[in-house]
């Protein structure tokens, strides 16, 4: 163990990171299809590389106009991110866009449309009719580190990434380019964040910018200082933080020209920054019949309400499904010794308050809507800039009554 305390690190990336471009494209296609046909079945994967975007996957939808417009949807999202010139390494207006999308497998569709409970067990409840779109395990987490009940390292990393994009788009630092990454290392003592140890900020920039005289001081003042001034954390000492700005030197070649990108390759950035476990399934480009996405959202909803209800200071919940079955095959609750009541009672209360069948999750969180594109960057959880249904604290009183 370090003499400075236990050090934990999380990272975030900006919306111009190649993998995040892909997440954004996939979710923009999803939203367009859901807007026209809320029952669309969508599994869209995107790959970007120098001058090229490839969009592939499986879609079943009645949204014919939106489907036919996918190429324009792709271009508009890339331009919105900020890749609008070959000088920046990528141009959404002129890049090649290749579409290779088929229909959802009928073998998968039968298990989603008519769950095992309805087909085999004779269940009459309409919520037993929709089965899980795949087997798998999903985790949710909440902790009282921050007002949004997220681990502090990932919350701070996301704030820095959002600020990087903000100062680029609003013209405060117009020489910045869309690609960028942030990393935050925090010292903990007895599970309490006590000191901001290291911040790494790497950002793409115009070629004629002096790193020492311009970029470094600008990033410290306009990005780091602004974020830390707004943080106002009770226990965190940020007075002696080590700051590394573009530690490799210049970062001119970025975006898809610097690295190929793929949908679903930033799943730790998307969730809890490595602080909590992950079931392995990515989110972007998937409609809510895919429990990789909808059940992970439901688990965050569960965990956040448990902590907000004062049942534990931190909690991790796991749910698991079998493909084609509505009811989960397992639920697991871990409170890490922070519980205020018996964890067995917490698990029982969760089962009473939350219906974790896929159809019920979709109903209760109102997921058949075009709400996913904003989640493609800066995290799916703990967002303070977007109203997301799985972040609402609407089950606190129900949990307290159930206990």
From Swiss-Prot:
Catalyzes the formation of S-adenosylmethionine (AdoMet) from methionine and ATP. The overall synthetic reaction is composed of two sequential steps, AdoMet formation and the subsequent tripolyphosphate hydrolysis which occurs prior to release of AdoMet from the enzyme. The gene is metK. It is found in: Cytoplasm. K(+) binds at residue 45. PROSITE patterns: ADOMET_SYNTHASE_1 (PS00376), ADOMET_SYNTHASE_2 (PS00377). Keywords: ATP-binding, Cytoplasm, Magnesium, Metal-binding, Nucleotide-binding, One-carbon metabolism, Potassium, Transferase. One of its GO terms (biological process) is one-carbon metabolic process. The keyword Metal-binding applies. GO terms for molecular function: ATP binding; magnesium ion binding; methionine adenosyltransferase activity. This is S-adenosylmethionine synthase. It comes from Mycobacterium marinum (strain ATCC BAA-535 / M).
């Amino acid at each position: 163990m370090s003499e400075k305390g236990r050090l934990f690190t999380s990272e975030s990336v900006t919306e111009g990171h190649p993998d995040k471009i892909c997440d954004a494209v996939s979710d923009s296609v999803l939203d367009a299809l859901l807007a026209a046909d809320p029952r669309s079945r969508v599994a869209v994967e995107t790959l970007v590389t120098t001058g090229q975007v490839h969009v592939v996957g499986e879609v079943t939808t009645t949204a014919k106009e939106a489907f036919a417009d996918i190429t324009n949807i792709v271009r508009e999202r890339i331009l919105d991110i900020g890749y609008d010139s070959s000088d920046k390494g990528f141009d959404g207006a002129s890049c090649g866009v290749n579409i290779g999308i088929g229909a959802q497998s009928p073998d998968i569709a039968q298990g989603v449309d008519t769950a095992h409970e309805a087909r085999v067990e004779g269940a009459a409840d309409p919520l037993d009719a929709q089965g899980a779109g795949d087997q798998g395990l999903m985790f949710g987490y909440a902790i009282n580190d921050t007002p949004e009940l997220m681990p502090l390292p990932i919350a701070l990393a996301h704030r820095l990434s959002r600020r990087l994009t903000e100062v680029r788009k609003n013209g405060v630092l117009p020489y910045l380019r869309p690609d960028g990454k942030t990393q935050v290392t925090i010292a903990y003592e007895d599970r309490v964040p006590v000191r901001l140890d290291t911040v790494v900020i790497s950002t793409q920039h115009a070629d004629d910018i002096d790193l020492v005289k311009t970029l470094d001081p600008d990033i410290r003042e306009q990005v780091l200082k602004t974020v830390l001034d707004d943080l106002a954390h009770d226990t965190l000492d940020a007075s002696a933080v080590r700051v590394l700005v573009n530690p490799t030197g210049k970062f001119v070649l970025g975006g898809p020209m610097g690295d190929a990108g793929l949908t679903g390759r930033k799943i730790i950035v998307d969730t809890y920054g490595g602080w909590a476990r992950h079931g392995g399934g990515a989110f972007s480009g998937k409609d809510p019949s895919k429990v990789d996405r909808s059940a992970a959202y439901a688990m965050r909803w569960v965990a956040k309400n448990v902590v907000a209800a004062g049942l534990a200071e931190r909690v991790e919940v796991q749910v698991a499904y079998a493909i084609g079955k509505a009811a989960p095959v397992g639920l697991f609750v871990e409170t890490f010794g922070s519980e205020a009541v018996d964890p067995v009672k917490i698990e029982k209360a969760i089962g009473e308050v939350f219906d974790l069948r896929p159809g019920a999750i979709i109903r209760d969180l109102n997921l058949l809507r075009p709400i996913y594109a904003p989640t493609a960057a800066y995290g799916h959880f703990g967002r303070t800039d977007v109203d997301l249904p799985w972040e609402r604290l609407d089950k606190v009183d129900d949990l307290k009554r159930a206990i």
